[in-house]
Regions:
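Extended catalytic core of nucleotide-activated donor transferases of GT-like folds
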Residues: 1-3, 58-66, 74-183, 200-201, ...
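Active-site regions of enzymes building and remodeling cell-envelope glycoconjugates
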Residues: 2-20, 143-149, 168-170, 185-192, ...
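C-terminal amphipathic helix plus adjacent low-complexity
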Residues: 4, 9-50, 67, 71, ...
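Short, surface-exposed amphipathic charged segments that create phosphate/polyanion-binding patches used
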Residues: 9-13, 163-166, 203-212, 309, ...
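Nucleotide-sugar donor-binding catalytic core of glycosyltransferases
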Residues: 19, 30-89, 184-336, 356-360
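Catalytic binding pocket for nucleotide-activated donors in carbohydrate/polymer assembly enzymes
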Residues: 70-79, 88-101, 105-109, 164-169, ...
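Hydrophobic/aromatic beta-strand patches that form the interior of the parallel beta-sheet core
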Residues: 130, 147, 170-172, 190-192, ...
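A short, gly/pro- and small-residue-rich
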Residues: 141-163, 230-241, 343-352
């Protein structure tokens, strides 16, 4: 912004207020630098004071919005471009709402914005806000509908704090592990599995499908798993995993008691690491007619994976192209079979091979759409079988569309308004 309008621009804008001036490459005297700094510091202090006042006004106005629900509904979705999944989920929901003719503001933060500035939401005056992993509800008025989809074990879910829930807050949970956390806080919720973005992930007939199996996703090993007191439980669980243990809820409770470990940590970190990383190592050790390709962060640290490691793919077109080129998509995960990667793969025509949680998980079963494995031999038998049966992805994709999720949101709003 022009230096002569610096104060006004900072006060009424929503960019983060700068902290320092960089004089690099400028041939100016120390005296001039000092004069600039003095003026800059005074301007910044004034801007901070005015910004607080204006934000307070925004918050007060937002809290007291009186909305007219007879007019077309306005939907507000905020996202951060530093997130790897959340921003794309929010964007897909926003795009689906737009396709249905809704008025939508998709507010993508790119790192320069002041996250405490509520200018856009004040100006837009939404009837509905939709958030991923965060409630973002304390500043909302009673009229606003707020939908929150928890897809990760956020700190405010795991800790013992109370969560502020309004009458028009509606919570969705991705996994049974998050169900448990919400139940502990006495928060009502609905189950919502991942959805598929069919605009990015679809059959591409220009890509030749080859006899190969691909894995796309990060390795789960981390420093938090290298502690001695964690290695003991890892060794114990790894032995059970290699012998085909089903890891029912009762079995997990038994392990929690035996090792005095937090159940959420065991399920979201230890089990996820063992099921994913060890399974990929199994895959790379099987000699079959299928070419193996592994993509994602962290796999180059495994010597056995390096010959098959192909780097990191960008979200969207690059991932879709790889899945369109593969016969199988390997997608082992402890908590759930219906991951984003499974949906993306099926939309692109690759048959998923997933870790078998049937019988111990309450998620839907799609035998007609995927292969299941629990042991090394299960995986080997799939890859060594010369007669691969065709799979039907239609039910899986239809039941996990963003259209269906958005319809659920719209139906919830309509029913709530009718019941008032």
């Amino acid at each position: 912004m022009p230096i002569e309008n610096l104060l006004e621009g900072l006060v009424y804008g929503r960019e983060r207020i700068p902290e320092i001036i960089d004089f690099s490459g400028l041939d100016i005297s120390s005296k001039v630098k000092m004069e600039i700094l003095t003026h800059f510091d005074m301007t910044i202090e004034q801007a901070k004071q005015y910004r607080v006042q204006i934000n307070s006004k925004y918050l007060s106005e937002i809290k007291n919005f009186k909305l007219d629900f007879s007019e077309p509904l306005r939907f507000y979705l905020m996202a951060n471009d530093q997130t790897t999944v959340m921003q794309f989920v929010s964007k897909s929901i926003a795009d689906t709402l737009k396709e249905k003719g809704c008025d939508v503001l998709f507010d993508l933060y790119r790192g320069t914005e002041d996250i405490t500035c509520f200018k856009k939401i004040y100006e837009y005056k939404p009837h509905v806000t939709i958030n991923i992993n965060h409630l973002n509800n304390r500043f909302l008025g009673n009229d606003v509908f707020n939908f929150v989809w928890f897809q990760d074990p956020m700190e405010h879910l795991v800790d013992s704090s109370d969560l502020y829930i309004r009458n028009r807050d509606y919570i969705f949970s991705l996994l049974p592990a998050f169900d448990m956390l919400l139940e502990k806080k006495s928060i009502p919720f609905q189950r919502q599995n991942f959805c598929i973005d069919s605009t990015k992930y679809k059959i591409d007939k220009t890509v030749k499908r080859e006899k190969k199996i691909v894995f796309i996703g990060s390795a789960y090993h981390g420093e938090d798993l290298d502690r001695i007191n964690v290695l003991e439980v890892i060794d114990y669980i790894m032995n059970l995993f290699q012998n085909g243990e089903s890891f029912s809820n009762e079995k997990m409770d038994e392990i929690v008691k035996k090792f005095s470990k937090n159940k959420t940590f065991l399920e979201t970190r230890v089990m996820s690491y063992i099921v994913r990383d060890l399974s990929v190592l199994w895959l790379c050790s099987i000699k079959s007619d299928y070419e193996v390709e592994v993509y994602g962060w962290g796999w180059d640290s495994y010597e056995a994976v390096r010959p098959y490691y192909k780097g990191v793919l960008k979200y969207g077109e690059e991932i879709a192209k790889v899945y369109n080129s593969a016969a199988f998509a390997f997608a082992p995960h402890f908590s759930y079979a219906l991951q984003n990667r499974v949906l993306e793969a099926t939309a692109c025509g690759a048959i998923p091979i997933v870790y078998d949680r049937r019988g111990v998980s309450d998620e839907p079963v799609y035998d007609e759409a995927m292969y299941y494995f629990k042991t090394f031999e299960d995986l080997r038998n799939i890859l060594m079988n010369n007669k691969i049966e065709e799979k039907d992805f239609s039910r899986l994709l239809e039941e996990h569309s963003y259209v269906r999720f958005v319809d659920k949101i719209l139906d919830t709003i309509q029913k709530s308004l009718q019941n008032e």
